[in-house]
């Protein structure tokens, strides 16, 4: 260590006592009850006002106007002298002799005679039936499950499906796998996805 080590003082510091602070005593101020001053009521003397006597109203005397009966003047009737017009004697009508209508002759109705067309008997020719040749049931081709069986056919692509004319053209060009939309040999319940197709193509191309 550089220098002289500082000598520690031998004085012992008095152990500090933890000062406990006492909370200041709260002084509760004595509440003075507020005294309400009651205002002294002044008795006001009411003056009695003398009521004035209202003079009784006299009903106004109704004037009854004397109604005069209207006198109707009767117009003097003028007597008009009527002239008697001489009546003209009407000539007696002559009764016209009725012409006797000639008795109508009832034309004898002729019953229309219908001509019955003579039926021609047409001789039907019996058409000789051609004997239909019995169809032979087409021999079912047994599809081999081996993978090499498809590739064995000449001029057919490597794809496992029902081959079409497009497959033959592709195989002739030297390509192993065609891109035809021929029907794949799969079960009708199976659903194919794009991923499964890609995986299968990769396997076929790898061969």
Swiss-Prot record:
> Looking at the record, which segments are called 3 X 24 AA repeats of V-R-K-V-A-A-K-K-T-V-A-R-K-T-V-A-K-K-A-V-A-A-R-K?
35-136
**Top-level taxon of the source organism:** Bacteria
The record lists its disulfide bonds as: none
Keywords, alphabetical: DNA-binding, Repeat
User: Where do the segments described as Disordered lie?
Assistant: 1-72
An example GO biological process term is: chromosome condensation
GO function terms (MF aspect): DNA binding; structural constituent of chromatin
Q: Report if keyword Repeat is assigned.
A: yes
Q: Where is the composition biased (Basic residues)?
A: 1-50, 59-72
What residue spans do the sequence repeats cover?
Answer: 35-58, 71-94, 113-136
Q: Which NCBIfam families match?
A: histone_lik_HC2 (NF038052)
Function noted in UniProt: Might have a role in establishing the nucleoid structure of elementary bodies.
> What family does the entry list?
Belongs to the histone H1/H5 family. HCT subfamily.
This one is known as: Histone H1-like protein HC2
Protein's organism:
Chlamydia muridarum (strain MoPn / Nigg)
